[in-house]
Curated annotation (Swiss-Prot):
This is Tryptophan decarboxylase. GO terms for cellular component: cytoplasm. The keyword Lyase applies. It is an enzyme of class 4 (lyase). The lineage of its organism: Bacteria, Bacillati, Bacillota, Clostridia, Eubacteriales. InterPro entries: GrpII_AminoAcid_Decarb, PyrdxlP-dep_de-COase, PyrdxlP-dep_Trfase, PyrdxlP-dep_Trfase_major.
Length: 417
């Protein structure tokens, strides 16, 4: 590990205190030229002892503005201290979590996974138009049918056609011959440049796509492409202690990755992350942002520096081995659940190394779905699946209660058939 290590509470406090001392403090400076200030102290008062002992809350109240991308542009006169935390965080994620080589990466903390995915699509659309002189109608987004709806938001906002690739009902995998025929047809109608959204843990199934499947077929047809991996759910679990992982930066075909701190990492909402290889993010530079010292290449404008600090603190609290232990605990709970489902001969889908179990609809009645807040694939009578997500709060006692109800329902259900 190059950047990721476990910190004590005192070490974290000292590091963040030092960062805040290098960050603009509106109380002790004559700052009158920017439209910003600290949080309103009639509501966000900082004189409680618990605030003084919380590096995150002190950062939140000091209110650093992390506008821009600080791995790309090193301007840091106003908020340089917490900028440094975000820079370190991006390199930690790219190299120590996502298995990048000893190189630099670009990235920033977004408002969520949706923004990170749209940032990627924006970067690659502009890359193809600027670097390859592509016509707008020659560019397409391509992704699996199980992909998060943010891909469709990006398609709409960027006015790029999107191609949806069907998946097998049971394996949730893209079939090579299906993808081949779809790409061939797209080429025949004039598509030459492809933005791939490849999944590392889909929202409904936790399924993982093979980026190399896309790469091999595009290479076969001599087509240009950029692969973005949506790891909003799977990014903090699937690559951990997983030698089979092909969806990270160890794969030369992967250009960028989305992560989301507010899911597996249990960070506050607003802690998505976009990480990319160098020499890509400059394609979204907004030259008109002339009054900003930083070069503005991000979809977000102003954003809270406390979100970057929150993500860094969670990772630093555990360290790589503490995090591995936590992830393996959730995997073991998931394996226990799957064993019970196997014993009951209930059909389900689960991706290796993931903590989502998706059960076929026929084995779940309305009462069970409502009692455990099981999420359907669609909220209408055509629904085929319900999902279970084994998060930190989902202990074996809860899973055992679910198993009891499933066993009771399916025993009665089978008798009636």
């Amino acid at each position: 590990m190059k950047f990721w290590r476990k910190y004590t509470q005192q070490e974290m406090d000292e590091k963040i205190t030092e960062s805040l001392e290098k960050t603009l403090n509106y109380d002790n400076t004559k700052t009158i030229g920017i439209p910003g200030t600290k949080l309103d102290d009639t509501v966000f008062y900082d004189d409680h002892s618990f605030v003084k002992h919380s590096p995150y809350l002190r950062t939140f109240i000091q209110n650093p503005n992390h506008i821009g991308c600080h791995t790309y542009d090193k301007a840091d006169i106003l908020f340089g201290g917490t900028f440094d935390i975000e820079r370190e965080l991006i390199q930690l994620l790219a190299i120590d979590v996502l298995n990048g080589n000893d190189e630099e990466f670009d990235g920033y903390v977004t408002q969520g996974g949706t923004e990170a995915n749209i940032q990627a699509m924006w970067v690659y659309r502009n890359y193809f138009k600027k670097e390859r002189k592509a016509k707008h109608e020659e560019i397409a987004i391509i992704t699996s049918a199980d992909t998060h709806y943010s891909a469709y938001k990006g398609s709409d906002l960027l006015n790029i056609d999107i191609i949806k690739v069907p998946v097998d009902f049971y394996s949730r995998k893209i079939q090579e011959n299906t993808l081949d025929s779809i790409v061939k047809e797209a080429k025949e109608i004039g598509k030459k440049y492809f933005i791939v959204i490849s999944n590392m843990g889909t929202t409904m199934f936790g399924s993982v796509d093979d980026p190399d499947l896309y790469a091999n077929i595009f290479d076969k047809y001599n087509l240009e492409y950029k692969i973005h991996v949506d790891g909003a759910f799977g990014g903090f679990i699937y690559p951990i202690d997983n030698k089979e992982c092909k969806t990270d930066f160890s794969n030369k075909n992967v250009s960028s990755i989305t992560l989301d701190g507010h899911k597996m990492l249990q960070a506050p909402y607003g802690t998505g992350i976009f990480v990319s290889r160098k020499n890509l993010i400059h394609n979204t530079l907004t030259k008109e942002a002339t009054y900003i010292e930083n070069l503005d290449v991000t979809l977000s404008g102003s954003r809270s520096g406390s979100n970057a600090v929150a993500i860094w603190m969670v990772l630093a609290s555990y360290g790589p081995y503490g995090w591995m232990e936590k992830i393996n605990k959730l995997r073991n709970r998931t394996k226990w659940l799957c064993k019970q489902l196997n014993d009951m001969r209930i059909k389900y889908y689960k991706e290796d190394s993931m903590n989502i179990v998706t059960i076929e609809e026929q084995y779940v009645n309305k009462e069970i779905a409502e009692k455990y807040f099981l999420v359907p694939e669609v909220h209408n009578p055509t629904n085929n699946w319900y999902k279970i997500v084994v998060m930190e709060h989902v202990e074996l006692d809860i899973l055992n209660s679910l198993v009891y109800d499933l066993r009771k329902f399916n025993k009665e259900h089978l008798k009636a058939m």
